[in-house]
Regions:
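Conserved core architecture of multi-subunit DNA-directed RNA polymerases
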Residues: 1-252
C-alpha cells in the first residue's frame, strides 16, 4: 500500500503567523548542516552538507533516510544551521529598538508604573500599566494588530517610556541611557558623555529577560518572544522545495 493512500485529509481551521522558537527549528530538523559543500567528486552528497539526503531526495530510485520514501512520496525535511554567534534579524530592527527603549536596561521590566493611582487617565485607582494595557487591548479588538491605530498606541508607549521622566527605572532604581540605532543593525546605549555598544549577545540577553506580561506594551503577545529575532539557529529548507538551475544539462537544486 502506498504512503499516499494512508493519509487522512484534514481541514485547516486557522493559520497563525508569528515568530518561530529556535528550539522548534532544532526539533523539526532532520540534520544539522555543518558544511557549505554539496557533492563529492563521486557524485554523492556530503553528510551534513547542503544536499544531505536526510533533507529529502530528488533522484529516482533513492530513498530518503529520514522517512524511507522515494522522491515522489517524500515531502522533504528541514535541516538547520547552528550559528556560532547570534545575529540580529534586519527585518525586526524596529521591534528591537522599541523593546530596548521601552524596558529597563537592568531588570528588563517595562518603564511604566505598576502602582495604583499612577494612571494618566481618569481612574484614580488604575496603574499606568493597566491604563496602557487596556488601551492596547481595546485597539486590538476594534482595529487589529495590523492597523494604523495599533502602531500609534505602541509608538505612544515607546515615547512615554523613553521620555526624560524615565531616566531612572521605577522598579529597580537603575539609571537609564538613551538607545541609539546606527543603521542597519548596531545598537548603542548612551549615558551622558559615555556610550556603550550593544552587541547581538547583549541585545538577546536583554530581550530574553522581558516578562511575558509586559510584551503587550511593545506590540507582542505571550506566544512569541522578542529574543527570537536575534538569531542563533537558521532553518534550512527541504531540498525538494528549493529553486533549481540547469548546469551542464543537469538539474541542480540550490
Amino acid at each position: 500500500m502506498s504512503r499516499k493512500s494512508t493519509m487522512i485529509p484534514k481541514r485547516i481551521a486557522q493559520i497563525r503567523f508569528g515568530l518561530m522558537d529556535p528550539s522548534e527549528i532544532r526539533k523539526m530538523s532532520a540534520v544539522e548542516v555543518k558544511t557549505a559543500d554539496t557533492y563529492k567528486d563521486d557524485g554523492h552528497a556530503y553528510k551534513q552538507g547542503l544536499m544531505d539526503p536526510h533533507m529529502g531526495v530528488i533522484e529516482p530510485g533513492l530513498l530518503c533516510p529520514t522517512d524511507n520514501c522515494q522522491y515522489q512520496d517524500s515531502p522533504g525535511h528541514f535541516g538547520h544551521i547552528q550559528l556560532e554567534l547570534p545575529v540580529i534579524h534586519i527585518g525586526f530592527v524596529n521591534l528591537i529598538k522599541t523593546a530596548l527603549k521601552a524596558t529597563c536596561n537592568d531588570c528588563s521590566n517595562i518603564l511604566l508604573h505598576s502602582e495604583p493611582g499612577t494612571s494618566p487617565g481618569s481612574n484614580p485607582e488604575q496603574s499606568e500599566q493597566d491604563y496602557y494595557r487596556n488601551r492596547i487591548r481595546d485597539v486590538i479588538t476594534k482595529h487589529g494588530v495590523g492597523s494604523t491605530e495599533f502602531s500609534k498606541i505602541i509608538k505612544e508607549v515607546e515615547k512615554v517610556t523613553s521620555g526624560t521622566k524615565r531616566k531612572v527605572c521605577m522598579h529597580c532604581g537603575s539609571s537609564q541611557g538613551k538607545i541609539i540605532l546606527d543603521k542597519p543593525t548596531t545598537f548603542k546605549e548612551k549615558h551622558d558623555n559615555t556610550e556603550r555598544k550593544l552587541n547581538p549577545r547583549d541585545v538577546r540577553e536583554w530581550l530574553s529577560s522581558i516578562p511575558p506580561e509586559h510584551l503587550i506594551f511593545i506590540g507582542m503577545d505571550k506566544q512569541n518572544r522578542p529574543e527570537w529575532v536575534v538569531l542563533k539557529v537558521l532553518p534550512v529548507p527541504p531540498i525538494t522545495v528549493r529553486p533549481s538551475i540547469t548546469l551542464d544539462l543537469s538539474l541542480i537544486h540550490i
